[in-house]
């Protein structure tokens, strides 16, 4: 049984993407730059190849962080921060150019949107790991992933109901990424220790401000940065997402309860991982941040992918039970950690083994969804994806029309 039904197939044929980027920086600075960049790509290069190439930059960035700081609590060489910044800039550029290439080659389709947003969902995890390397924040890296994942999920949820993806005047894909790669480049000059030491040492001006309730507590600068990101970006964005969805639901005389139910799988994911980490006898968040973030990142990607597919196929609003498939595995490590609590800290199964299995499960589930949906949309729309021969040339990835005839 496939992921797309007969109604979904007909909807895909009529689907048209609607989006708006209200960022002033994007409009007057980056858009002209991206418009020039797209001319550097040959017309035969499919948009999805550009998307995939941009995503691999972040995978490489996370890999560098793992090689030089496996627990993300030691300072990597300075050039690694420079590489993090450059690779993130390239990712942002390629992510913006792929859509322009699709319009340039008249190859836009729902599959391109799904492929692009699917890579972006996974990118949250890989860039969080790169940022964790730069901030030297260890287990706190998971919280930085959360700062990216929450607005991303809520924006996808809002898009599901409003049918238009609106990026506000200041948004994550533009100004947010710019701040992050500037932080990487800044760390190339200062060193990662600047973020990991007490914020009053990094910013001496705060040493003059009387804070009696914090005078005996050492607070790393990255914790202050995390709080500022939550208060200044995440909370306002979430409030806007909920408000926009509520406005649309009320205008259609729908149920806000059904709308909010679609957030439950994401809440269940965060709750399950949080319970596992709090009970963990081996402190997995501190000792294995890469495996934890990657496993949860692919879990998150699966949830986002199912919601995007539901939007593309105009499925009924409400909870999607299939989304809980990605959460089933979390029952085992939680039970294993509970057993350790009553067994003098000795789990039945080594947590490193469970973490590896968790990653394998979520990666496998995500790839199954991705490959299946690619083939189903390809057949539904009569397009090729990832590889095709056009006029004697082999196209390695992307979306190209099927030639007429047999």
Would you name each region that the model predicts?
Residues 59-64, 122-134, 181-188:
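Membrane-interfacial alpha-helical segments at the cytosolic side of multi-pass membrane proteins
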Residues 10-77, 81, 91-93:
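N-terminal signal-anchor/initial transmembrane insertion module
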Residues 54-111, 127-128, 139-151, 222:
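Membrane-embedded alpha-helical segments that form the functional core of polytopic membrane enzymes
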Residues 39, 102, 106-119, 167-170:
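Juxtamembrane helix-capping/reentrant segments at transmembrane boundaries
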Residues 47-50, 109-113, 141, 176:
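Alpha-helical transmembrane segments and their helix-entry boundary regions
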Residues 23, 87-88, 116:
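Alpha-helical transmembrane segments of multi-pass integral membrane proteins
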Residues 98, 112-128, 172-179:
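Alpha-helical transmembrane segments that form the membrane-embedded catalytic/substrate-binding core
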Residues 1-44, 148-406:
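C-terminal membrane-associated helical module and adjoining short loops/tails
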């Amino acid at each position: 049984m496939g992921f797309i039904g007969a109604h979904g197939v007909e909807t895909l044929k009529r689907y048209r993407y609607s989006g708006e980027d209200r960022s002033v920086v994007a409009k007057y600075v980056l858009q002209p730059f991206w418009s020039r960049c797209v001319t550097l790509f040959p017309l035969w290069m499919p948009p999805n190849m550009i998307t995939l190439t941009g995503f691999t930059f972040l995978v490489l960035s996370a890999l560098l962080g793992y090689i030089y700081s496996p627990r993300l609590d030691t300072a990597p060489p300075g050039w690694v921060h420079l590489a993090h910044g450059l690779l993130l800039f390239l990712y942002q550029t390629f992510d913006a150019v792929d859509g322009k290439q699709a319009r340039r080659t008249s190859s836009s389709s729902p599959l391109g949107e799904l492929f692009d947003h699917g890579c972006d969902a996974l990118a949250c995890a890989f860039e969080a790991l790169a940022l964790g390397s730069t901030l030297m924040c260890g287990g706190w890296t998971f919280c930085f992933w959360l700062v990216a994942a929450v607005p991303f999920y809520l924006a996808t949820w809002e898009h599901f109901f409003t049918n238009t993806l609106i990026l506000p005047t200041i948004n994550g894909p533009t100004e947010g990424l710019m701040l992050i790669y500037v932080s990487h480049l800044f760390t190339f000059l200062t060193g990662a220790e600047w973020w990991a030491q007490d914020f009053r040492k990094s910013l001496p001006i705060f040493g003059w401000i009387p804070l009696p309730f914090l005078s005996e507590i050492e607070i790393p600068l990255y914790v202050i940065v995390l709080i500022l990101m939550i208060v200044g970006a995440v909370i306002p964005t979430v409030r806007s997402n909920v408000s926009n969805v509520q406005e649309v639901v009320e205008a259609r005389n729908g149920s806000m309860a059904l709308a909010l139910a679609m957030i439950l799988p994401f809440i269940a994911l965060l709750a399950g991982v949080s319970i596992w980490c709090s009970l963990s006898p081996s402190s997995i968040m501190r000792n294995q941040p890469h495996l934890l973030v990657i496993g949860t990142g692919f879990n998150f990607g699966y949830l986002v992918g199912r919601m995007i597919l539901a939007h593309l196929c105009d499925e009924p609003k409400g909870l999607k039970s299939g989304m809980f498939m990605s959460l089933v595995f979390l029952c085992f490590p939680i039970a294993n950690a509970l057993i350790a609590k009553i067994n003098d800290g000795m789990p039945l199964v080594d947590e490193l083994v469970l973490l590896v299995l968790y990653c394998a499960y979520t990666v496998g589930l995500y790839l199954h969804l991705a490959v299946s949906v690619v083939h189903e949309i390809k057949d539904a729309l009569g397009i090729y994806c990832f590889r095709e021969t056009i006029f004697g040339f082999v196209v390695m990835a992307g979306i190209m029309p099927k030639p007429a005839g047999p």
